[in-house]
C-alpha cells in the first residue's frame, strides 16, 4: 500500500508507523478459512478475565470509566502450528461466554446460541515486535516482527460486538 514503506538514503527501507484501515468483511473467521484450505483448525484458550478496556475500546463499547469488559485470549493453530494469538474484548452483556467452550469458532457460537452475527466494523494492520510471552506462544523470538491486526466489530443490530487484537505468525 502506498505510504507503507519509508526509504531513508544511506539507511534503508523501513515500515512506516501509519496504520491502514480496512472495512470489516462480514467475519469469515479463522475456522472457516482453515476449512477452505484443508487445514485442521484448533484452539487453545489461554486466559479469560474481566479487564478495564483501553480508552478506544471504552468509547467503542460506550462504557463508563472503570467499567470492565470480558477478555478472551486464545492461540489459534492450523495443523497444530501456531497461526494467530488473538485477544478479544466483549462487553459484559456477553459475560456468559465464560461458561461456554471457547475452543470453537466464536462466530459460529455467537450465531447458533446467541443469534448474533458480526456484520460491520473496521480493522487496521500494522507491524509489531512481539513480547517474550507472545514470542513463546508463536514459537518465535522476543522482538521478532509480526503482523498485528486490530478489529472493531458490530453486530446485525449495529451494536458493538467485540474488539480484537490478533498477532499473525509469518
Describe these PLM feature segments.
Residues 1-15:
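N-terminal helix-turn-helix
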Amino acid at each position: 500500500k502506498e505510504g507503507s514503506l519509508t526509504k531513508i538514503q544511506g539507511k534503508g527501507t523501513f515500515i512506516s508507523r501509519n496504520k491502514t484501515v480496512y472495512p470489516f468483511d462480514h467475519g469469515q473467521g479463522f475456522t472457516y478459512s482453515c476449512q477452505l484450505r484443508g487445514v485442521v483448525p484448533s484452539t487453545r484458550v489461554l486466559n479469560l478475565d474481566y479487564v478495564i478496556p483501553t480508552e478506544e475500546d471504552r468509547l467503542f463499547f460506550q462504557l463508563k470509566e472503570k467499567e470492565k469488559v470480558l477478555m478472551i485470549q486464545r492461540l489459534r493453530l492450523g495443523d497444530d502450528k501456531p497461526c494467530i494469538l488473538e485477544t478479544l474484548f466483549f462487553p459484559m452483556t456477553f459475560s456468559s461466554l465464560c461458561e461456554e467452550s471457547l475452543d470453537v469458532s466464536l462466530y459460529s457460537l455467537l450465531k447458533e446460541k446467541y443469534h448474533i452475527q458480526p456484520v460491520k466494523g473496521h480493522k487496521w494492520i500494522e507491524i509489531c515486535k512481539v513480547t517474550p510471552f507472545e514470542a513463546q506462544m508463536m514459537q518465535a523470538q522476543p522482538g521478532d516482527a509480526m503482523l498485528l491486526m486490530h478489529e472493531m466489530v458490530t453486530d446485525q443490530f449495529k451494536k458493538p460486538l467485540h474488539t480484537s487484537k490478533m498477532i499473525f505468525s509469518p
